[in-house]
From Swiss-Prot:
The presence of a 'disulfide through disulfide knot' structurally defines this protein as a knottin. Expressed by the venom gland. It comes from Centruroides exilicauda (Bark scorpion). It is found in: Secreted. Reversibly blocks Kv11/ERG potassium channels. InterPro entries: Ergtoxin, Scorpion_toxin-like_sf. This is Potassium channel toxin gamma-KTx 4.4. One of its GO terms (cellular component) is extracellular region. Disulfide bonds join C5-C23, C11-C34, C20-C39, C24-C41. Keywords: Disulfide bond, Ion channel impairing toxin, Knottin, Neurotoxin, Potassium channel impairing toxin, Secreted, Toxin, Voltage-gated potassium channel impairing toxin. The keyword Secreted applies.
Length: 43
């Protein structure tokens, strides 16, 4: 789910990141972005 994406994904400080994107899409969201090394999912 969405929280697991945030918890397990390390990413670049800013911008899109492939693993976040994949995880967020599996959680049913449109895309994932990075903010300060954490994934954020965009519904």
């Amino acid at each position: 789910d969405r929280d697991s994406c945030v918890d397990k994904s390390k990413c670049a400080k800013y911008g899109y990141y492939y693993q976040c994107d994949e995880c967020c899409k599996k959680a049913g969201d449109r895309a994932g972005t990075c903010e300060y090394f954490k994934c954020k999912c965009n519904p």
